[in-house]
């Protein structure tokens, strides 16, 4: 999976250029930096709302696709991604005789979607208002209103797809409590946490028809025989856990997929909220784009491809 995401990321930040009529941008900040700040704001919200890694990946995907589909008109040689994915209606196109600020349109599309798929909207709306005010001071009213309207049109096409991806139906499923049968998953002490997104396999996919397209070797069968592969692998993990270096512990914590980590100290238990693995991939995308000095359209494409790949 990491190799696949790296390939997608590299594809998303390689070359292109030419232009639709683009209005003035915010003084003192590049269009690409606006997109980076938008994604970072979404990451902070995902942490605050404690979304699981699968749900976080869905949030990033829809919001980042909306952003890209709006800003790609800044460079017409960039093609639509949604028309290459499953279940999306055709995207609207801007009036070629009118001026737009496509970064503003992308921001509007991004946060229209973000508000549909997250909970804690106060901080999001506050940030969005600040960004809108900065754009309003940089472009005329007609360009501002036209760009906002275009971003909203893009978002509405994304909304039509996200309400039909089976996510809402999976919210009504009973908790997965596991099984007491040997070798089956069940909640374990000390926290007895629920199983995570056990119905995720019923979600409508973006690209693959079936997971069979990417065959994965079956894990070793459960066995309590000390000579079995299953037993040996578990012992190996246990033995290594006793000799971990501080660096190895930091790496493990960094990629830990639990956004709500329970900590235990004697009789005291407390929880820490933290970034999901998907959030790390979005952060890595930001680093790659900044290091390669990717422009705004290339940056939006990289975020969208990475998020869909998750």
Give the ranges of each region predicted by the language model:
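Sec-dependent signal peptide recognition
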Residues: 2-8
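Acidic/polar surface patches and capping/hinge elements
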Residues: 19-310
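C-terminal motif of bacterial Sec signal peptides marking the signal peptidase cleavage site
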Residues: 14-17
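Generic cytosolic/nucleocytoplasmic N-terminal low-complexity/intrinsically disordered segments
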Residues: 1-2, 20
